[in-house]
UniProtKB/Swiss-Prot annotation:
It is found in: Cytoplasm. Homotrimer. Binds to both RNA-binding sites in the C-terminal region of Rne and to RhlB. It comes from Enterobacter sp. (strain 638). Belongs to the RraA family. GO terms for molecular function: endoribonuclease inhibitor activity; enzyme binding. This is Regulator of ribonuclease activity A. Keywords: Cytoplasm. Transmembrane segments: none annotated.
Length: 161
């Protein structure tokens, strides 16, 4: 399904929160939407492997990496795992790497930057916690919609049809 965040903001202005324009699209899917699972981890993506091994149909992994752009939390292997398990997308308040490979995958991926240095894989972090960045507070179960224009968040699913 294709999402137009500008149109959704026009229709649901009172029901959505707009994330500050910090993010760029790195995935092969220009728009995506779904229910979020929140993760908080800093320069360590071990927990992301565990979560992306789960069925992701209709879900988006929302990663609070503390805004660090020193180490990439998402790489091509993690993105392929997400795609294999039918995740709709990944939003990272942090960095990604292997950008050329990410662009080839039919997966929504938004992050604040790219860097070639990979993250540690110790599994340090927590999931299903409240996270806050970009002027918005996110909870697991909220609904996120993203495209090349921006990212919006709604407590309940929006009627897109």
């Amino acid at each position: 399904m294709k999402y137009d965040t500008s149109e959704l903001c026009d229709i649901y202005q009172e029901d959505v929160n707009v994330v500050e324009p910090l993010f760029s699209n790195f995935g092969g899917r220009s728009s995506f939407g779904g229910q979020i699972i929140t993760v908080k981890c800093f320069e360590d993506n071990g927990l992301l492997y565990e979560l992306l091994e789960q069925n992701g149909r209709g879900r988006i992994l929302l990663v609070d990496g503390g805004g660090s752009v020193r180490r990439a939390l998402i790489d091509a292997d993690l993105a392929r795992l997400a795609l294999q398990n039918e995740w709709e997308g990944i939003v990272v308040y942090g960095a990604v790497r292997q950008v050329d490979d990410l662009e080839e995958l039919d997966l929504g991926i938004q992050a604040i930057a790219a860097i070639p240095v990979g993250a540690a894989g110790e599994g340090i972090g927590e999931s299903d916690v409240r996270v806050n960045f970009g002027g918005v507070t996110f909870f697991s179960g909220d609904h996120l919609y993203a495209d090349n224009t921006g990212i919006i968040l709604s407590e309940d699913p929006l009627d897109i049809e």
